[in-house]
């Protein structure tokens, strides 16, 4: 089975970005995407990992990669942010537990400086997990995620190639929303790159995935707007179980 883990809401940019091989000039690190703290502004870096992560960013280290070919700045990694994904939690855990087998998950709040609309929130919950073991592969990851959605009763889920700075190969799972005639991204997934795992001393493949809980519920409960979860509509709340049951047994 899986073990549940938790992590801090206020996080070092080091864990939120740098340890995940996300370059310091990446657009996601800009203030229009990420909430940075004014006070306190900086935190304490894990000194045993700083030089290893720095080398991977600048030259690729001994991974065979060329890195990002820029001058990595300690002061950027020291900044404190409201975590933008719970991958910061799983990468912290992986740094402390580099040996297999590992099967952990997290369901927790994250924050993004985004324009709010029918499928985006500035504060929401993310479902996150990793599996690390000898011989695991991308096919195992696809099977795990497919089984997860199947047991929830979601139909019309498919996988398509994607890109994330910290996984390769990468994919996303999407579900078709008939009422909106569109595909909605549910989860991003992939295998952690060597530039992520090697500085942590991890020697085996790590399957990783993460996606919004509210988006999953949006698909499960036939909602038109993700903001409905925070409207406190008692009539809708009382009817949730019926909506889900109808969808689970194929009545919708």
Each language-model region and where it sits:
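TRNA-recognition modules of translation machinery and tRNA-sensing kinases, especially anticodon-binding
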Residues: 1-252
């Amino acid at each position: 089975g899986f073990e549940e883990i938790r992590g801090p809401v206020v996080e070092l940019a080091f864990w939120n970005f740098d340890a995940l091989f996300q370059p310091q000039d990446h657009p996601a690190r800009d203030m229009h995407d990420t909430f940075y703290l004014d006070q306190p502004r900086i935190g304490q870096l894990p000194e045993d990992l700083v030089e290893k992560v720095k080398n991977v960013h600048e030259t690729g280290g001994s991974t065979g990669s060329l890195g990002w070919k820029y001058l990595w700045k300690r002061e950027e990694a020291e900044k404190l942010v409201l975590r933008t994904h719970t991958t910061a939690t799983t990468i912290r855990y992986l740094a402390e537990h580099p040996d297999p087998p590992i099967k952990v998950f997290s369901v927790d709040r994250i924050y993004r400086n985004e324009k709010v609309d029918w499928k985006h929130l500035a504060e929401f919950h993310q479902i996150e997990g990793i599996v690390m073991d000898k011989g695991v592969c991308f096919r195992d990851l696809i099977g795990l995620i497919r089984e997860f959605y199947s047991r929830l009763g979601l139909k019309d889920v498919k996988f398509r190639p994607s890109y994330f700075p910290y996984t390769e190969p990468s994919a996303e799972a999407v579900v078709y929303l008939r009422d909106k005639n569109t595909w909605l991204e549910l989860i991003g997934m992939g295998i952690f790159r060597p530039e992520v795992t090697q500085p942590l001393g991890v020697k085996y493949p790590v399957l990783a995935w993460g996606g919004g809980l509210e988006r999953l519920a949006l698909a499960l409960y036939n909602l038109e707007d993700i903001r409905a979860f925070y409207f406190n509509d008692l009539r809708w709340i009382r009817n949730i179980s019926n909506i889900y049951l109808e969808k689970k047994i194929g009545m919708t």
